[in-house]
């Protein structure tokens, strides 16, 4: 009868012998266990048979190759074979996995420790941060990082309490997909210590933002919360000013699209991160401030309720908030739409009958019109997202699509100051061009301006500096830039709308209603013919000459006259506007893949 030897595969200590002499064993069954470097290694039978000798006992030390036991080869009846353990895939999990499952339950909104607070939040009309994140991402695509972290307060609170009351240390972070594309999220959980910034949730942000930079992922930040948390005790911290989260997040500006959502109270550090975002969305009941009520009172500046500090009635007209949403449901939908503009063309699009454009600018040159109607007709139906609509209202800034292609848009608003560009409007337009250039969105400019705003009040706003930002920003941009003159194109204001010059754009075209001049016609007449007008004593005669001179300049500056002198590229049927824009954008080379590389150092927060 053949006899096989079983030898030690490694040097170690025998911690258990599982068979005895005369015992029947089957191939693959465990005979004994060796401990090597504090790890247990099973020694198994290579063939079936009967154990004929056992040469070691528990506690023995063996060298590699030492003989452990012998087995006489032979068939083992089915009923006598040592049966391997049967794995029950549907049975109860083993203890270590069960512990993980049990711990994960504390992260859910239906955890007993959270149910009451979740109900109270729902009663206020708000979703939880986890509900918002679930709504943001494609179904089942979100994977959380750092969910088992708890507040660093074990020196003052029981660990069990921290697990129940501070899940994820109040910061839900991870990666999912929006519209099929990977997106990162960092969401403060207001149900955990009022969404404050704890030691470990700072660590989680640091980790996430580093991964975001490495993978070039867009980021959505749910910023609701009260700022820094002084109650963490488990780390020796004096001021915590070495926290990297703010620097890491700011470094993403211009690298990847960043979206911030403020719902409810957003103060201090939470607000600082929000302000770093390319797009700031806030709900109607949000309050946003660099200092909350406690800081204000502590500074001896008065006592205020949270709702009195940075309400939307302040933060939207002053330009802090880009888009105001009715609630967090709409806020998440806006974030999804915003991210879609950076995901490439959409194959499905529709538009209004473009012949409507022929009738939206009145024939009478002094009659105002709603430029929003022009924008909505020109863009693909339902694709318009206007940014900062209550700030700098002399210029409309928006994102949209033309034949499915994402574009950025700036447009003078003739209903405000006749379309004149003031300081706020200039800042708003310059920042929007930066945003579009950073992420390679072509810019379409709809020009109808008498120029920049003039007068002592305008200059008191530091207009010289603000207005010049439009020139400097456009000169540094490399995205395709198309200017369409709807009516007025006068002076430096018109040049600024065209990126610095009518020949700085890829294409400058005008509708038949276009009128042009080096400055406003009325001002030009009063300046150039002042002496002649002053010499006429009869008011009617003076007015008649004035009207004649204005009419002469108007005729000279008509769109067809400008095209005749080739100061613009063409005068077109307004119904052809989309086609001409699409044609020139198609001729431009595609933007290179910039993942991991910035085109601009950052996108101005203002």
Predicted regions located by residue number:
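Short, compositionally biased
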Residues: 44-52, 75-92
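A contiguous, mid-protein "functional segment" used to position or interact
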Residues: 57-73, 576-586
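Short hydrophobic beta/alpha edge segments that flank linear recognition/processing sites
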Residues: 23-44, 63-80
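Short histidine-centered loop motifs in beta-beta connectors
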Residues: 9, 16-24, 47-48, 52-57
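Short beta-strand-turn/beta-hairpin segments enriched in glycine/proline and small hydrophobics
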Residues: 1-14, 30-48, 249-251
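Ligand-binding clefts of soluble mixed alpha/beta catalytic domains
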Residues: 81-606
């Amino acid at each position: 009868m053949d006899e096989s030897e079983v030898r030690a595969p490694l040097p170690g200590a025998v911690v258990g012998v599982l068979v005895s002499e005369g015992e029947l064993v089957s191939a693959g069954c465990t005979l004994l266990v060796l401990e090597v470097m504090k790890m247990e290694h099973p020694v198994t039978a290579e063939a079936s048979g009967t154990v004929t000798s056992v040469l070691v006992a528990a506690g023995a030390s063996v060298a590699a190759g030492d003989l452990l036991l012998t087995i006489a080869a032979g068939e083992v009846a089915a009923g006598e074979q040592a049966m391997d353990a049967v794995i029950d895939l549907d049975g109860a999990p083993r203890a270590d996995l069960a512990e993980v499952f049990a711990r994960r339950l504390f992260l859910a909104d239906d955890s007993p420790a959270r149910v009451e607070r979740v109900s109270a939040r729902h009663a206020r009309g708000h979703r939880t941060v986890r509900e918002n994140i679930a709504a943001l991402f494609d179904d089942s695509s979100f994977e959380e990082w750092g969910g088992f972290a708890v507040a660093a307060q074990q020196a003052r609170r029981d660990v069990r309490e921290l697990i129940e009351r501070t899940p994820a240390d109040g910061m839900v972070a991870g990666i999912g997909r929006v519209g099929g594309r990977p997106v990162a999220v960092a969401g403060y959980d207001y149900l955990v210590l009022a969404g404050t910034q704890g030691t470990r949730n700072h660590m989680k942000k640091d980790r996430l933002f580093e991964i975001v930079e490495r993978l070039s992922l867009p980021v959505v930040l749910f910023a609701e919360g009260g700022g820094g948390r002084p109650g963490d005790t488990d780390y020796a911290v004096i001021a915590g000013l070495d926290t990297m989260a703010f620097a890491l997040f700011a470094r993403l500006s211009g690298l990847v699209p960043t979206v911030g959502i403020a719902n409810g109270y957003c103060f201090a550090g939470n607000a600082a991160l929000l302000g770093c975002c390319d797009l700031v969305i806030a709900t109607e009941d949000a309050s946003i401030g660099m200092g909350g009520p406690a800081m204000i009172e502590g500074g001896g500046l008065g006592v205020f309720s949270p709702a009195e500090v940075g309400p939307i009635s302040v933060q939207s007209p002053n330009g802090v908030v880009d888009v105001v949403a009715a609630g967090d449901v709409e806020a998440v939908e806006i974030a999804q739409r915003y991210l879609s503009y950076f995901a490439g063309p959409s194959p499905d699009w529709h538009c209004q009958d473009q012949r409507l454009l022929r009738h939206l600018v009145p024939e009478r040159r002094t009659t105002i019109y709603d430029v929003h109607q022009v924008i909505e007709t020109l863009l693909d139906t339902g694709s318009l997202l206007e940014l900062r609509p209550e700030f700098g209202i002399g210029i409309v800034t928006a994102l949209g699509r033309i034949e499915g292609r994402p574009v950025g848009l700036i447009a003078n608003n003739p209903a405000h100051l006749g379309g004149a560009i003031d300081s706020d409007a200039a800042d708003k337009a310059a920042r929007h061009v930066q945003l579009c250039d950073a992420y390679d969105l072509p810019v379409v400019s709809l020009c109808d301006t008498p120029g920049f705003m003039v007068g002592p009040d305008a200059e008191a706003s530091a207009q010289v500096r603000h207005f010049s930002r439009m020139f400097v920003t456009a000169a540094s941009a490399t995205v395709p830039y198309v200017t369409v003159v709807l009516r007025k194109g006068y002076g430096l204001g018109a040049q600024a709308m065209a990126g610095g010059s009518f020949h700085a754009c890829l294409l400058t075209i005008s509708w038949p209603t276009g009128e042009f001049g080096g400055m406003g016609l009325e001002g030009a007449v009063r300046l150039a013919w002042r002496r002649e007008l002053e010499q006429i004593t009869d008011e009617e005669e003076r007015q008649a000459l004035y009207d004649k001179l204005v009419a002469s300049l108007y005729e000279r500056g008509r769109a067809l006259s400008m095209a005749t002198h080739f100061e613009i590229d063409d005068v077109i049927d307004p119904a052809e506007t989309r086609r001409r824009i699409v044609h020139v954008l198609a001729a431009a080379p595609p933007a290179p893949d910039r993942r991991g590389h910035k085109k601009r150092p950052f996108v101005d927060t203002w």
